[in-house]
Regions:
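Short amphipathic alpha-helical segments and helix-helix/interface helices
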Residues: 22-23, 43-48, 70-71, 196
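Rossmann-fold NAD(P) dinucleotide-binding segment
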Residues: 1-37
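Rossmann-fold NAD(P)-binding glycine/threonine-rich loop
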Residues: 35-56
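Structured helix-beta-strand junction loops
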Residues: 28-29, 49-54, 77
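Short glycine/serine/threonine-rich phosphate/pyrophosphate-binding segments
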Residues: 15-20, 42-43, 66-68
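Active-site-lining helix/loop region of Rossmann-like oxidoreductase modules
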Residues: 57-210
Length: 210
């Protein structure tokens, strides 16, 4: 979902309306806050053109952390970024990619890799599950050069993301274990909180982090 900051109050809109909302923001020169990394990748040319209309498109951190470190490292040279996402089967069983490829996650007893590719491919294959892959790619070496693995792990109760970064300024690892949202097990509770934090940051006179 995304938030269009209107003159009065924000309106929350389904991701399918991303392009129309983005175009309206550009036309009216209004900032856009979103957690839809896949929506940004699908409309990347429009996002790049935001500079021409002096409009800011903000991709909130969502369910991941460490984007400030990735952005800082990208000012130098990043050699590689690998992201490994592991989720309980109930968080992935309704994903379009899983259904289309008839991947069985029932009665799973051991971890099972269900996707391996780039962050671009992963964000488009799992638009409701791994928007964080797009965020990691955009903050760092680029989504086409960011490696991504997605696992279904029956032993987990939380959605887990690990990011491994090698660069000329620092090598670092990021790990987060997100509590599942009751409304959508594929999304972590912290995702909505990241949008609130983003809005507070915009309104605050003090900014922490890159």
């Amino acid at each position: 979902c995304l938030i269009y900051i209107a003159p009065n109050k924000p309106a929350i809109t389904p991701k399918v309306a991303f392009k129309n909302i983005l175009q309206n923001c550009l036309l009216n020169r209004k900032p856009l806050i979103t957690i839809s990394g896949s929506g940004i990748l699908d409309n990347f040319e429009l996002v790049i053109n935001a500079n021409k209309s002096k409009t800011q498109v903000i991709l909130a951190s969502g369910a991941i952390l460490g984007l400030d470190g990735l952005r800082a490292a990208s000012e130098g040279k990043i050699f590689s970024v690998t992201m490994v996402t592991k989720k309980p089967p109930n968080a992935l069983k309704s994903a379009k990619f899983v259904l289309e490829n008839k991947i069985s996650l029932e009665k799973l007893s051991d971890p099972k890799i269900i996707f391996k590719g780039t962050a671009t491919e992963g964000a488009k294959a799992f638009p409701a599950n791994v928007n964080v892959a797009a965020a990691v790619g955009l903050a760092g070496i680029g989504p086409d050069k960011t490696s991504l693995e997605i696992w279904a792990d029956p032993k987990l109760t939380r959605n887990t993301h690990q990011v491994f970064v090698k660069s000329d300024s620092a090598d670092f690892e990021i790990k987060i274990e997100n509590m599942q949202s009751k409304e959508n097990p594929g999304t972590g509770k912290i995702t909505a909180l990241s949008v609130i934090a983003c809005l507070r940051g915009i309104a605050s006179s003090l900014k922490t982090g890159t």
